[in-house]
Structure formats: structure tokens, C-alpha cells
Amino acid sequence: MQIDLNADLGEGCGNDEALLALISSANVACGWHAGDAATMLQTVKWAIEKGVAIGAHPSFPDRENFGRTEMQRDPEAVYADVLYQIGALAAMVRAQGGQLHHVKPHGALYNQAARDPALAEAIVRAVRDFDSDLIFFGLAGSKMIDVARKAGLRVKEEVFADRGYNADGSLVKRGTPGALHEDEEVALNQTLTMVREQRVRAIDGNWVPIRAETVCLHGDGDHALAFARRIRERLGAEGIAVRAGA
């Protein structure tokens, strides 16, 4: 058995180089919610050195709120936003002799697209038009996975180590009870259950089927690095290899 571990990097959290030794895929902020040209280039260099798959992590234009504020943007504007950000990161990857591997939307763009097919279509179209060989990372079982698959893109269904789930498979909204698992053991056990059993316990206590193809480890928490090490150790002990895959 194998699983991909991904993390959102280039967001100014200071753990990036160390985290890259523990993950298999990196989602690099493209400057619209965090980061800038210098952080993008540095993160790309580190990822190439460590053999980590590189993905673009496009956002709504929202640096003030770290890309976590929902917006009602015209689909054509979103298409242009995403295409612009992918292109910027891809240029840096290419200049360093690497190859862009995937695209994962960030924050509010991700969460809205998970339930809004029109928004998802704009994002997916930008990815496909830029490079139809790119892999699309999206919330497991969501509308954006369906849209990406129908558009002919390869997908990876994403689950979250430290986030709570609703009964419909959506993430519990940040700022509400149960949104984040502060207890590392709870997050570790949730991750192993999702990977091995392809299910997750929702906040209402019921089990929800879930397809876990890539696990997101948040890189912006106080204990992000220590938690990533524990995840790697537990996966290794269970005989589960960590690989980006194709």
C-alpha cells in the first residue's frame, strides 16, 4: 500500500525546507494569498533537490485574509486568475529543470469549488488548457473532482489529516467546533483509518466512505513539523509507503 502526503508551502511559515523531507507532493503558493516570486523560486529549488512533486496552489486574490474569504467572481475572471498563477509557477519550475506535476486550489477557492460546479469548471478549464497532463487535487467525493474527471484530467482525491468532516463528506467550516483536531493522536488515527479503510468518522459520529489518494498535512500550525514526522513514522510502521505517484 502507498499514499501521497502533500503540504501547502511557500506561505511564509518557516517550516518548508524541513517539511519537504517528509512529504511527497508540495503545493506552492503563487503569490495571491501568500508568498511572492522569491519564495516561489526558493520552494521550487528545495522541492527539486528533495525529489518532491511540485504543484501550483492558486487562490482568490486575497492576501489580506490568506485566501480564506469566499468571493463571487465571474467564472471567466477565475479562469484567468488560475491560468495566471499556474503559468507563473510553471515558469519557475521549468527554469530550474523540473516539471509541474499538479494543481490544488487554495482556501475559499477550494471550498467553494467543492460544491459549485460552475466555479470548479472555470478552475479545471484553466488547468486543462494550460497542460492536460497535470493532475488535479481536490476534496474527495466533491463536485470539483467530478468536474475534473469529466474534463479528462487525472485526479487525486484529497483528505485532511487534522480537519473534521461533516456527514456529507465536506469539511467542517473553520472557526466552528470540530473543524480542527488539536489532539495529534486523533489526527493520526483519522489519517490511518482514511488510508487503510477508506472511511472517516464524521462529527455526528457516523462513518462516511471516503477515497483517500493524497493526504494534506497543514504546514502552518505550531506543531506541523513534529506532526509530519509522526505521520511518516506511523505510516512506515504500518508498511504504507509514501510516494507522489502518477
Curated annotation (Swiss-Prot):
Q: Where are the transmembrane segments?
A: none
Annotated CDD domains = LamB_YcsF_YbgL_like (cd10800)
Q: Name one GO biological process term.
A: carbohydrate metabolic process
Pfam families linked to this entry: LamB_YcsF (PF03746)
Sorted alphabetically, the keyword list is: ATP-binding, Hydrolase, Nucleotide-binding
* Top EC class for this record: hydrolase
Q: What EC identifiers does the entry list?
A: 3.5.2.9
* InterPro entries attached to this UniProt entry: Glyco_hydro/deAcase_b/a-brl (IPR011330), LamB/YcsF/PxpA-like (IPR005501)
Q: Which residues form a coiled coil?
A: none
Q: What terms describe the molecular function in GO for this protein?
A: 5-oxoprolinase (ATP-hydrolyzing) activity; ATP binding
User: Can you state which reaction this protein catalyses?
Assistant: 5-oxo-L-proline + ATP + 2 H2O = L-glutamate + ADP + phosphate + H(+)
Q: Which HAMAP family match?
A: PxpA (MF_00691)
Q: What protein family is recorded?
A: Belongs to the LamB/PxpA family.
What's the stated role of this polypeptide? Answer: Catalyzes the cleavage of 5-oxoproline to form L-glutamate coupled to the hydrolysis of ATP to ADP and inorganic phosphate.
Share what the entry says about its subunit structure, partners included: Forms a complex composed of PxpA, PxpB and PxpC.
Q: Which NCBIfam families match?
A: PRK05406.1-1, PRK05406.1-3, PRK05406.1-4, PRK05406.1-5
Q: Return the protein name.
A: 5-oxoprolinase subunit A
Q: Organism, per UniProt?
A: Cupriavidus pinatubonensis (strain JMP 134 / LMG 1197)
Name of the encoding gene? pxpA
